[in-house]
Amino acid sequence: AIYEFLQNAADCGSSLFYLFYDEKYLIAVNNGEAFNQKGLRSILNISQSVKQSASEIGRFGIGFKLVHRLVGKGDGKDELVKDLKGPIMFSWSKKIDLLSLMNGENIEAVDNISDDSDLPYLLKLILTNFPAGPNETVKNLQYEDTVLFTQEEYLEMGSKIKEYLSPHLEQDDFNQGSIFFIRLGEGKKELLDKDYEENFKTGVEYSLNTLKGLKNVKVNSNQLVEVPLKMEKGEIAQESEEFIRISPEYKDAPIHYAFGYDQIDFNSENPFAGVERLKVSPTFYKYFPLGDETHNSAIFVHCDSISNQANRRKLQDDSVNKELLPEIAKFIIKKLDEYKDVNNRTAYLQLFSSILLCGNVPSNSAWVNQYFYNALLEHIKVNVPTTNGYCDNSSFVKIRRLKCNIPLAIANDKYCWFEWNADIDSLKPIFDAAKTKLGIKEYGIVDFIKDADTEKLNLWIQNADAETYTGFMTELNSHSLLDVSSKIKSIKLFKFSDGSFYSYDDIITSQYNYTYRRTDYLYKTDSVCLFSSSKTENIQQELKTIGFVVSESNLDKYTNIKVRFNMPTDAHVFERISNKLNPNNLSLAEKKKLILHFATTDSTIKFEGIGESSIKGLCLCRNNNGEYVKLGNMLSRSYVVPSWLSAFQILSSWFLNPCILTLFKG
């Protein structure tokens, strides 16, 4: 019923509408054009309307009859029929007449007034369509004389209007307007409260986008403010092929329609608050919301020719709507394309996101998908915004999880990044919708490695600057690489001391050990490369001195990469080093450092499986004869030996180190 009052306010060109009510009274006020005789007939006619203009909201009028139910308990029938209760209407075109009413001044009826008269109308509506004047004697249903609009009611009305309206007279324009005054029936305040909270408030706040002049709407102390939407308006001309095909009920004017969407601020803390508010509000409006058409939609749709059921709450599943809705969808698509063509990127992203974030239509309105939503969804699938423009195939679009700055073309030159990065938590709803509706997938470092052209990737790694390379390796190591275990071995990830990058497969091979029935992993015999590790980090320079090419990075610092490498045993590495030792190329200090490193008891750097016997096999030290002899084959200087054995003692320059001392046999 509240919408009936607001509808009248909009139709008569009001700039404001106030509704005041409490337990006993309801007062609806607007400052639009005063009623004329034609308008009065519209209110009094039963289940029809004299309104014919396409711009008049109430032209289809089930109308004002809903208001009458407010006068009594339940549907108000007993009060309407037995007690002859009804709403009182006052319509004026001079402010002095409003003031006279508020002050309870005497009034008198005037007969045979012309339609262009500026006299006010004051009447009580009995049985929904019988006008009773103040203090007018008429026949009741028993054909007895009675006064249905008493002086007491007139004074009561003026007093209550003065109480509620006086605070607004100075600041607002009331030089013309209409007032409806009702003594409320039992329980009606509670129903009005419920209707306001559940339907009216949100519906009107969106409807104000389509009601050009009506901007100041207040219910009791609550000011209703227009929820601003980006509105786009269109029309279907009379006599056009589309108009003829739609065949709207009223053919006196073009079909006017509009759609709206939230102007999303993607950088805000809660960018989709406006979208979520739209989604829990009615989707379709005929100036006011069709209350049962809440489609979980982020698109607002208004049309003056939409076909709705008699209760004004639901779309008709009929030929009018099945021809009309596709035309509105085409208009939305046209606007999307226009935004793209004129490079209005912001508007495109907002509308694209609004379409994408539309939820599932309730089952009882599922037919709307076929005639409206499906076309919108199909269009955005082939017009996906990307960081480089737009993509016509959503399967090539990826939601970026990749943090490092590496060209996506290395994976696939058709791939492109979705407009927004997945690491922005506030945009999660749009990523979820893109995955579900567009088939777009998140794309991280593991996905990239899986798809990457190995040669292109190797070339990029080779040419990357230090900061970019470090970022790439850090990100790669931060993920489990189980799904790319084989491929990761073929990528030249690590730079070595000769300035080149090598892959695991370049350096290490596998060999089946039949004796132990196992696969051994060994450094290739034709390679001089060694992966650096925590166990070799302290002897990097010595290894390079004896001819090894070692990785600049410590492999142990890349645990998720290393775990995918089948590394040779410490014993194999020790053997490889031992075989390459040339004591002539090492200084005395370097030789000592190698022996002490292998002989350490520090478990973090000690070679597993390498004990005293292995170290004694190293040929790094001279005896007193100046010959290089294995450590295990020299005598300690701590013993007194015959002169002929002194030649087999270690040189005195080695003897002083206690660690080395323990390696000699007595």
Where are the model-predicted features located?
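Hydrophobic/aromatic residues in the conserved F-box-adjacent beta-strands of the Bergerat ATP-binding
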Residues: L26-A28
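Flexible ATP-lid and adjacent glycine-rich G1/G2 motifs of the Bergerat
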Residues: N31-L98
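Hydrophobic/aromatic-lined pockets within catalytic cores
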Residues: A10-S14, Q48-K51, G72-D75, I333-K340
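A generic beta-sheet turn/junction motif
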Residues: Y21-E23, T294
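Conserved ATP-binding N-box helix of the HATPase_c
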Residues: A1-Y21, G63-L70
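GHKL/Bergerat-fold ATPase module
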Residues: G76-G666
